[in-house]
């Protein structure tokens, strides 16, 4: 890239030096921290203000450079708080900036803010580096595709801390900064590329429909394309604004300050009459800390106190490392709980989990379907050998499907292999659009069945087993068809024996007051409104499922205590009475595990499956908790 003039080069370096000072190495999280902002200022003014604010004990928390590289403008937010020493640079060409970056990196400093403006061959850079403890961090400012950033991190999971799309519409460049994701923080960032531009309005709506999610940064390009970043941390009340002029931004800051909200991110783009800003406001300038809480009792072990300390320690290590906010663990003996603990690792605006709170169960829901079939067989209302489609009056396109019986469906050997033909339980939108109504209404379970029977099987029934969500869905339809009672009503009357087990409804609006938040960062197209392009959270249809139609396979909710009690008299896997085995459940926003082990039955529920890795969860369910149960004898 071309070098800047000597005058600008000296200005950037002198400004860098004037902003250097050492502060204590411990930040404070203060709701009422004094906040200073400026925007639409040139480099000299930015340097002057930086020097004065540093002298008064302020730290920079948001930095944006924009406009022409020959006369870049700056927007910044400073907060008066203690913290580690830091360095600042601005108006630096690529060579100067990279040299500065490497110099301070070699001294243990970490990049925390980065911005750039101008065409790829003549861009100028600005940034902040702090003397903080981040084991691994990565920054690349020559990316031609933002998705290529993941190739630079060496498989280290990172949180994007800084971003700028610069260059020209014909020759984009992306500057991305990421810090190693310690604690499994959940964030998203939605990139635009020359071939795809994010619809900000619909993306913003989808992301903030996820409970407790908020915008953290609204990065802005010179041509006013917003790259939004979202987080699930808590900063109290918040608001945002986009496409603001300088005068509108000033007015907005004053209006929000009167409400007790302060700017925590300002991004600028354009120059002259095209200068525009995005801004995020919040009650707090830094996220709330998480707190550890435990509820419930352990009553049935020889040493209840020691057992309590051990299992609480196991769960705390797992939850803090993996960022899991809500969980339960329960143990039962002959249908009576001898331990029920609920765990919360969350901010103070989330509910503290109680032992009787209910969690989405994912595929653990299938054991209620198996118990229903067992009830029908034991009451001579159904046989395991009954051909299912003939019973329901269907004529499948594939004649082999006429041989599918109840046992095939229970054993996942009916001829459906989701690795070959897809999983209908997550295809409600596609199925609805294939109907004569062309997606004018959501698909029902009956629509799914009729869609499937018109397709060829993936293998001959009985040849082998392939895990299927469709098989239990079909069996739940059989239950309703035989009894004349809706499946959920049948469960309540004949299977649950008073246990609090219920349907987890699809719509996010049904869960705004839930104590348990089924957490997922993912969104997807809405299957309840198949003609809409609207995005919805993963647990609320974004995974493609309409849960009201999937009750037999993965849509039920209950507490860990209810699960442990239930498997004391019902097969946790298979069909019939209690048997030593286990069942696993995984779904967007949910993870559950139940096991009958020797004489005891135990259950684990989590409000997310987005922990660090499956290895972490496997260690918990297959080793840590079973080892605990082996090490602490049951009383009596």
UniProtKB/Swiss-Prot annotation:
Primary role: Serine-type endopeptidase that cleaves Gly-Gly bonds in the polyglycine linker of host plant class IV chitinases to disrupt their chitin-binding, and thereby plays a role in lowering the defense responses of the host to the fungus. Degrades Z.mays Endochitinase A (CHIA) in vitro, although corn is not its host species.
Task: Report the locations given in the UniProt record.
Answer: Secreted
**EC number, UniProt record:** 3.4.21.-
Q: Which reaction does it catalyse?
A: a glycyl-glycyl-[protein] + H2O = N-terminal glycyl-[protein] + [protein]-C-terminal glycine
Organism the protein comes from: Fusarium vanettenii (strain ATCC MYA-4622 / CBS 123669 / FGSC 9596 / NRRL 45880 / 77-13-4) (Fusarium solani subsp. pisi)
- GO terms for MF: serine-type endopeptidase activity
Cellular-component GO terms for this entry: extracellular region
Q: Does the keyword Transmembrane apply?
A: no
In residue numbers, the region (Disordered) covers 512-540
**UniProt cross-references to Pfam families, sorted A to Z:** Beta-lactamase, BTRD1
SUPFAM superfamilies per record: beta-lactamase/transpeptidase-like
Give UniProt keywords alphabetically.
Disulfide bond, Glycoprotein, Hydrolase, Secreted, Signal, Virulence
This one is known as Polyglycine hydrolase
- Glyco sites are at 30, 151, 383, 481
Residues annotated as the enzyme's active site? 363
- Disulfide topology: 141-175
Q: What enzyme class is recorded for this protein? A: hydrolase
Record InterPro entries: Bact_CellWall_Synth/Modif, Beta-lactam-related, Beta-lactam/transpept-like, PGH-like_rpt
Give the residue range of the signal peptide.
1-22
Keyword Disulfide bond found? yes
Q: Which family, according to UniProt?
A: Belongs to the peptidase S12 family.
One GO term (biological process): effector-mediated suppression of host defense response
């Amino acid at each position: 890239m071309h070098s800047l003039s000597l005058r600008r080069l000296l200005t950037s370096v002198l400004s860098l030096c004037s902003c250097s000072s050492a502060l204590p190495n411990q930040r404070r999280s203060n709701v009422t921290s004094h906040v200073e902002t400026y925007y639409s200022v040139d480099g000299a003014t930015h340097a002057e203000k930086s020097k004065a604010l540093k002298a008064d004990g302020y730290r920079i928390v948001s930095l944006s450079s924009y406009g022409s590289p020959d006369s870049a403008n700056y927007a910044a937010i400073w907060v008066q708080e203690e913290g580690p020493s830091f360095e600042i640079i601005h108006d630096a060409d690529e060579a100067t900036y990279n040299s500065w970056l490497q110099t301070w990196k070699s001294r243990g400093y970490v990049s925390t803010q980065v911005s750039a403006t101008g065409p790829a061959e003549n861009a100028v850079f600005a940034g902040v580096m702090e003397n903080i403890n981040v084991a691994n961090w990565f920054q690349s400012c020559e990316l031609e595709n933002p998705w290529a950033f993941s190739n630079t991190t060496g498989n280290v999971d990172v949180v994007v801390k800084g971003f700028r799309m610069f260059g020209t519409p014909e020759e984009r460049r992306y500057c991305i900064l990421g810090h190693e994701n310690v604690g499994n923080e959940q964030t998203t960032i939605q990139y635009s590329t020359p071939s795809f531009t994010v619809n900000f309005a619909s993306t913003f709506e989808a992301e903030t429909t996820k409970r407790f999610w908020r915008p953290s940064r609204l990065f802005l390009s010179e041509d006013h394309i917003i790259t939004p970043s979202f987080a699930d941390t808590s900063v109290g009340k918040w608001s945002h604004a986009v496409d603001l002029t300088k005068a509108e931004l000033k007015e907005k800051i004053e209006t929000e300050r009167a409400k007790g909200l302060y700017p925590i991110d300002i991004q600028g783009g354009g120059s002259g009459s095209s200068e525009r800003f995005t801004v995020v406001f919040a009650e707090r300038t830094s996220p709330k800390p998480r707190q550890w809480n435990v509820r419930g009792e352990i009553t049935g072990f020889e040493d209840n106190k020691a057992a309590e300390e051990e299992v609480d320690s196991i769960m705390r290590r797992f939850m803090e490392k993996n960022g899991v906010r809500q969980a339960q663990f329960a143990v039962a003996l002959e249908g009576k709980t001898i331990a029920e603990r609920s765990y919360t690792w969350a901010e103070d605006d989330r509910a503290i989990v109680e032992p009787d709170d209910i969690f989405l169960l994912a595929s653990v829901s299938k054991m209620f379907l198996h118990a229903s079939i067992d009830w029908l067989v034991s009451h001579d209302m159904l046989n395991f050998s009954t051909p299912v489609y003939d019973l329901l009056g269907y004529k499948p396109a594939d004649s082999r499907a006429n041989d599918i019986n109840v046992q095939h469906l229970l054993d996942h050997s009916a001829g459906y292999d989701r690795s070959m033909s897809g999983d209908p339980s997550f295809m409600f939108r596609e199925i609805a659009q294939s109907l004569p109504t062309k997606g004018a209404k959501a698909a029902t379970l009956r629509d799914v069945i009729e869609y499937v029977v018109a397709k060829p099987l993936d293998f001959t029934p009985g040849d082998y087993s392939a895990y299927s969500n469709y098989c239990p869905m079909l069996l739940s339809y059989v239950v309703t068809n035989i009894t004349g009672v809706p499946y959920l009503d049948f469960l309540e009357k004949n299977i649950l024996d008073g246990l609090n087990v219920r349907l987890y409804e699809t719509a996010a609006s049904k869960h705004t007051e839930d104590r348990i938040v089924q957490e997922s960062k993912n969104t997807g197209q809405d299957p309840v409104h198949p003609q809409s392009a609207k995005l919805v959270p993963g647990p609320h249809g974004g995974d493609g499922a309409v849960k009201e139609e999937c009750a037999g396979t993965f849509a039920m909710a209950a507490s860990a205590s209810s699960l442990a009690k239930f498997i004391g008299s019902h097969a946790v896997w298979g069909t019939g009475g209690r048997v030593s085995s286990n069942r696993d459940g995984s779904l967007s926003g949910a993870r559950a595990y139940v096991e009958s082990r020797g004489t005891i039955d135990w259950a684990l529920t989590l409000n997310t499956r987005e922990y660090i890795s499956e290895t972490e969860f496997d260690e918990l369910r297959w080793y840590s908790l079973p080892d605990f149960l082996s090490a602490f004898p049951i009383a009596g």
